[in-house]
Amino acid sequence: MTDTTILQNNTHVIKPKKSVALSGVPAGNTALCTVGKSGNDLHYRGYDILDLAEHCEFEEVAHLLIHGKLPTRDELNAYKSKLKALRGLPANVRTVLEALPAASHPMDVMRTGVSALGCTLPEKEGHTVSGARDIADKLLASLSSILLYWYHYSHNGERIQPETDDDSIGGHFLHLLHGEKPTQSWEKAMHISLVLYAEHEFNASTFTSRVIAGTGSDVYSAIIGAIGALRGPKHGGANEVSLEIQQRYETPDEAEADIRKRVENKEVVIGFGHPVYTIADPRHQVIKRVAKQLSEEGGSLKMYHIADRLETVMWETKKMFPNLDWFSAVSYNMMGVPTEMFTPLFVIARVTGWAAHIIEQRQDNKIIRPSANYTGPEDRPFVSIDDRC
């Protein structure tokens, strides 16, 4: 037992954190994911994230979450073929995207694109599991198309063809972004990153999706709500801020000196610590290796060395460990991903987890309606309007 966790009936309970509302309070049951049961572990449907990230393509993990099992090779090939065929955008969705200004927040574009798709290809009445899975697959396949169709049209007037022959979601994203097939190394890096971001239990956006699903609403509405929650800087965007921090400096020494001063001044350094993990973020060790490999291949280790030095500084000064976002920033930057697309990439990965939770919440078939602790005044006498001061 540590000062941060307690064990009750063999169940790991997180000691509440003052900065996180409802921290440590169970809000429902799930068979999809466990986070931090031992302080630094993560499992999707019982599988260790380290095994999944090491051995699986992202599409395997998407199938695990959305369809309930790791696919056989034949099932994986069929699933990837299905996703390839779903990358296109209906004409009216493209029209909506063309109307959005270049200054739009990419997360607003994602939200709007999903809403337009939901109007064009609405969920059928009855809300079947198979129908929800089909919508999840359509979104998984076409979110990159939504983002990058808007991006290229709004920035240079180009109407790209969103369908490519790339074998993976990550490869499709990079191909649409850069206009050419990515290297195998970049595609592998995307597989790993998307796997790491795919699911994370009852985080704010996932819980939002479950609350909406619990009302009996459609899949699109639940996903749109989740995107809205992830847009908030207290939930999404940490890897964007992480890169901004890393890019302030020219050398690791400069970075260390400045961050030590900021820590002394009690400034918050984004990219470190976690509301649930108490020992380490298990995803960190994986993405750090990816960041180093990409940096070495790109012939530029500057950002990696700065990030690595600050990892040491934050542990020495605050005993705070880096989370997934810290070296994801380095990885995405080395693949030429614009900073404003970091959180939309989070959406592309997490739509798999959101969809799985929506389906699970529907099967529970209960509306989520918690109580509140009232903190207002009691038993106030009513004063008519003419007598009020």
Curated annotation (Swiss-Prot):
Q: For binding CoA, which residues are annotated in this chain's numbering?
A: 268-272
Q: What does this protein do?
A: Involved in the catabolism of short chain fatty acids (SCFA) via the tricarboxylic acid (TCA)(acetyl degradation route) and via the 2-methylcitrate cycle I (propionate degradation route). Catalyzes the Claisen condensation of propionyl-CoA and oxaloacetate (OAA) to yield 2-methylcitrate (2-MC) and CoA. Also catalyzes the condensation of oxaloacetate with acetyl-CoA or butyryl-CoA but with a lower specificity.
Enzyme Commission number(s): 2.3.3.5, 2.3.3.16
Its recorded name reads 2-methylcitrate synthase
- In Gene Ontology terms, what is a biological process of this protein? carbohydrate metabolic process
Reactions catalysed, as given in the entry: propanoyl-CoA + oxaloacetate + H2O = (2S,3S)-2-methylcitrate + CoA + H(+); oxaloacetate + acetyl-CoA + H2O = citrate + CoA + H(+)
Gene encoding this polypeptide? prpC
Q: In which pathway does it act?
A: Organic acid metabolism; propanoate degradation; Carbohydrate metabolism; tricarboxylic acid cycle; isocitrate from oxaloacetate: step 1/2
Gene3D superfamilies for the chain: Citrate Synthase, domain 1 (1.10.580.10), Cytochrome P450-Terp, domain 2 (1.10.230.10)
Q: Which residues bind substrate?
A: 82, 200, 283, 350, 369
Instruction: Tell me which family the UniProt entry assigns to this protein.
Output: Belongs to the citrate synthase family.
